[in-house]
Structure formats: C-alpha cells, structure tokens
Amino acid sequence: MMNAEAKPGDWLGKVRWDANGLVPVIAQDAATNDVLMFAWMNRDALAKTIELKRAVYYSRSRQRLWFKGEESGHVQHVHEVRLDCDEDVVLLKVEQVEGIACHTGRRSCFFQKFEGTVDDGEWVAVDPVLKDPEHIYK
C-alpha cells in the first residue's frame, strides 16, 4: 500500500507495499547482470539494506529479518538499489560473496530450465552445484 502523499525524503513511502507490508525483490549480479534470486522485504529490511549496504530480506516463513549470508556466509554487498516503474518491485545490484546465492549451493536460484513442449516438458537443472549444501549449513 503506497502512501499517495509521500513527502520529499520519505523514500519508503514511495514504495508500493503489498497488503502484508512487503515488496518483491530481485537480486542481480552487479558485474554480469545475472539474476541471482528473488525474495521479499518489509520497510525495516529495505532501510537496513540501505544503511548497511548489505542485503537484508524479510523471511515470511520465519517472520523476521533475514540477513543474507547470516548462516551460509554468502553475503550480498549492495552496490545499487532501484525501484521499478510501478514502484512495486525492488532491484538490488549486488556483489555475491563466494559466488553462491542459492541455498542449493548454486550461483543462482534460477537453475532450472524448461525443456520440451507444453505436452511433454520438464524442468531440468542446468547449473552446477558449486558447494554441497551439507557443507554450507552446519
């Protein structure tokens, strides 16, 4: 829900938050423009991200802020934050520490590619596991 009367300096008020106070976020590699992951932010997460220059998301399952890399060490250093034309999606341009953004140990969460036709298609994992998740989360 956007504040239609957003004042100068009220940059958080310009964002169109959903009914749950969240906004979708895409993390993109700042150097290659590869899409790394999708997550959610609330106001606190976006403010912390700006303040720390480090990606902070909102975990819907844990109902709390999620500092990317807090368990895995795969921190995202934020180089740039953008808001889309409808003001309802945030884009983070990041440097991905150790090159792993996905909890599966892959560079990107978008590692499954559709192959085939509408009648016999399937999702195929096309990107390699860079690090076994068993060794990431102990």
Curated annotation (Swiss-Prot):
CC per GO annotation: cytoplasm
GO molecular function terms noted in the UniProt entry: magnesium ion binding; phosphoribosyl-AMP cyclohydrolase activity; zinc ion binding
Pfam family, one: PRA-CH
Residue numbers binding Mg(2+): D84, D86, D88
Cofactor note: Binds 1 Mg(2+) ion per subunit. Binds 1 zinc ion per subunit.
Localization: Cytoplasm
Pathway it works in: Amino-acid biosynthesis; L-histidine biosynthesis; L-histidine from 5-phospho-alpha-D-ribose 1-diphosphate: step 3/9
Reaction(s) this enzyme catalyzes, per UniProt: 1-(5-phospho-beta-D-ribosyl)-5'-AMP + H2O = 1-(5-phospho-beta-D-ribosyl)-5-[(5-phospho-beta-D-ribosylamino)methylideneamino]imidazole-4-carboxamide
Cofactor(s) required for function per UniProt: Mg(2+); Zn(2+)
Sequence positions that bind Zn(2+): C85, C102, C109
Keywords, ordered alphabetically: Amino-acid biosynthesis, Cytoplasm, Histidine biosynthesis, Hydrolase, Magnesium, Metal-binding, Zinc
Matches recorded under SUPFAM superfamilies: HisI-like (SSF141734)
One GO term (biological process): L-histidine biosynthetic process
Quaternary assembly: Homodimer.
Family: Belongs to the PRA-CH family.
Its biological purpose: Catalyzes the hydrolysis of the adenine ring of phosphoribosyl-AMP.
Protein name: Phosphoribosyl-AMP cyclohydrolase
Classification lineage: Bacteria, Pseudomonadati, Pseudomonadota, Betaproteobacteria, Burkholderiales
